[in-house]
Amino acid sequence: MPADTPARYLAFADGSSLSNPGGPGGTGFVVVDRARPALRFGATRWVTDGTYAVTNNRMELRAVLEALDGLPEGEAVDVVSDSRYVVDALSKWIHGWRKKGWRTAAGEPVLNRDLIEALDARGRELRVRYSWVRGHDGHPVNEVVDALAQSAARGATGPSEANVIEALRAAAVIG
């Protein structure tokens, strides 16, 4: 897929951990199908994350996994995140980590390897491009996914479908 060609799906994802590490945490995502008027969004509260501590980075990665869940194999997806960690881990660092047996440049084990490998596997089923957006800088859809993640972490009701649609319109993602 050429770099300037929009993917069929556009996904925004964000994660939050109220105490980092320790949680509770939350994830939020919005997915738009550009080929037809379809929208999916959601949020999940995480009190525990298996044997791992709930951290902001784990919630950021989980939010992307939730956004990619259920998308048809082979489709192109543009994922937008305000986490440099997510964008760099999945588009840059992962190649070196694989070559080094899942070790960092410092020789340490890669943190969150389980989620990164899950995203890598899902990314191989899809055609995923990652891009970064500055967080808390007024991007309407990023603000909505942040609110979804924060609300989920607190166990509160998050933005409504009307709020999500309003943000998508404000960002000129939909008409």
Curated annotation (Swiss-Prot):
<dbReference type="GO" id="GO:0005737">
    <property type="term" value="C:cytoplasm"/>
</dbReference>
<feature type="domain" description="RNase H type-1">
    <location>
        <begin position="5"/>
        <end position="154"/>
    </location>
</feature>
<protein>
    <recommendedName>
        <fullName>Ribonuclease H</fullName>
        <ecNumber>3.1.26.4</ecNumber>
    </recommendedName>
</protein>
<dbReference type="GO" id="GO:0043137">
    <property type="term" value="P:DNA replication, removal of RNA primer"/>
</dbReference>
<feature type="binding site">
    <location>
        <position position="82"/>
    </location>
    <ligand>
        <name>Mg(2+) 1</name>
    </ligand>
</feature>
<keyword id="KW-0460">Magnesium</keyword>
<feature type="binding site">
    <location>
        <position position="60"/>
    </location>
    <ligand>
        <name>Mg(2+) 1</name>
    </ligand>
</feature>
<dbReference type="GO" id="GO:0004523">
    <property type="term" value="F:RNA-DNA hybrid ribonuclease activity"/>
</dbReference>
<keyword id="KW-0378">Hydrolase</keyword>
<keyword id="KW-0963">Cytoplasm</keyword>
<feature type="binding site">
    <location>
        <position position="14"/>
    </location>
    <ligand>
        <name>Mg(2+) 1</name>
    </ligand>
</feature>
<comment type="similarity">
    <text>Belongs to the RNase H family.</text>
</comment>
<comment type="subunit">
    <text>Monomer.</text>
</comment>
<feature type="binding site">
    <location>
        <position position="146"/>
    </location>
    <ligand>
        <name>Mg(2+) 2</name>
    </ligand>
</feature>
<keyword id="KW-0540">Nuclease</keyword>
<dbReference type="InterPro" id="IPR036397">
    <property type="entry name" value="RNaseH_sf"/>
</dbReference>
<feature type="binding site">
    <location>
        <position position="14"/>
    </location>
    <ligand>
        <name>Mg(2+) 2</name>
    </ligand>
</feature>
<keyword id="KW-0479">Metal-binding</keyword>
<dbReference type="InterPro" id="IPR012337">
    <property type="entry name" value="RNaseH-like_sf"/>
</dbReference>
<dbReference type="Pfam" id="PF00075">
    <property type="entry name" value="RNase_H"/>
</dbReference>
<comment type="function">
    <text>Endonuclease that specifically degrades the RNA of RNA-DNA hybrids.</text>
</comment>
<dbReference type="GO" id="GO:0000287">
    <property type="term" value="F:magnesium ion binding"/>
</dbReference>
<dbReference type="InterPro" id="IPR002156">
    <property type="entry name" value="RNaseH_domain"/>
</dbReference>
<dbReference type="InterPro" id="IPR022892">
    <property type="entry name" value="RNaseHI"/>
</dbReference>
<dbReference type="GO" id="GO:0003676">
    <property type="term" value="F:nucleic acid binding"/>
</dbReference>
<keyword id="KW-0255">Endonuclease</keyword>
<dbReference type="InterPro" id="IPR050092">
    <property type="entry name" value="RNase_H"/>
</dbReference>
